[in-house]
Amino acid sequence: VRERGNDRRGATARTPLNRERVIRTAMAVADEKGAAALTMRAIAEPLGVEAMSLYHHVAGREEILDGMVDAVFGEIDLPPRDTDWKSAMRRRAFSARTVLRRHPWAIGLMDSRSQPGPATLRHHDALIGALRAAGFSVPMAAHAFSLIDSYLYGFVIQELSLPFSSSAQLEEVAGAILRDAPAGAYPHLTELATEHALKPGYDYADEFAFGLTLILDALHPDETAGPDRATPTPRPGRRSAGPGTGPAASSPQHHRAGRSAAG
């Protein structure tokens, strides 16, 4: 691997370049500048190498994106096995929200990859397994998985898009809107702002827990719970569950793969 410049010292002592460093550096670039800024040159620059050096460790940009998505899933806490299913789903959802806020580019990529890595598959399998062990049938587990993640992704997208990130900023933004609005034109919006959003202690992040609780309370296992529910047993004449089953079967990624196979 050729290092940039001729005046670097201690080159022999620097950390060797490998696939993990390439992936982590790409994530750092995306965290700062967004996924659109991810060129091989942009990734190579902070590593102090030429862009062509990256190809010794990754096949190209697509493999880097695959690795980034897998690393994100690897940062999310798996549903714990020593608690009830609602607590497990809640803990996993809060962990996922924290991780996705840390990597704002991730949501747009997470369901777009056709070659999921081991952390992604392990995450999905653990989530489905927790629901199955609690007594959710395969279809109901798929519905629950899809519903929870649709809410999770949507909330994070909205949260990251807000024009404020603190109470002071919210007061400034809302105050300007109310001042510029014609008197009495928007009574309900004014009421919500003055009687709720601008009250001391208000935090938009609290809305996440409220909505998640509503979703979890609306979901119910539809089969008998038990530890053996998490491990499917192949039936005679049928293939065991595998790719194409569970929540992933409802994702855009799955449908694109199915169309490709059919064509």
Question: Which role fits each region the language model picked out?
Answer:
Residues R21, E63, R91, R122, ...:
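Amphipathic alpha-helical interaction segments
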Residues V69-E75:
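Short, basic, alpha-helical segments at the C-terminal edge of helix-turn-helix-like DNA-binding modules
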Residues V1-L17, P187-H196, P227-R239, P243, ...:
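N-terminal intrinsically disordered/low-complexity leader segments
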Residues D77-R122, V138-A141:
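Hydrophobic alpha-helical connector segments
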Residues R21, T25, V29-E63, G67:
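Helix-turn-helix
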Residues G108-M110, F164, L189, G201:
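Short, hydrophobic secondary-structure boundary micro-motifs
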Residues P182-L198, D203-L214:
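Non-DNA-binding regulatory cores of transcription-related proteins
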Residues H123-L147, Y151, F155-L178, H196, ...:
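Hydrophobic alpha-helical bundle segments that form small-molecule/ligand-binding pockets
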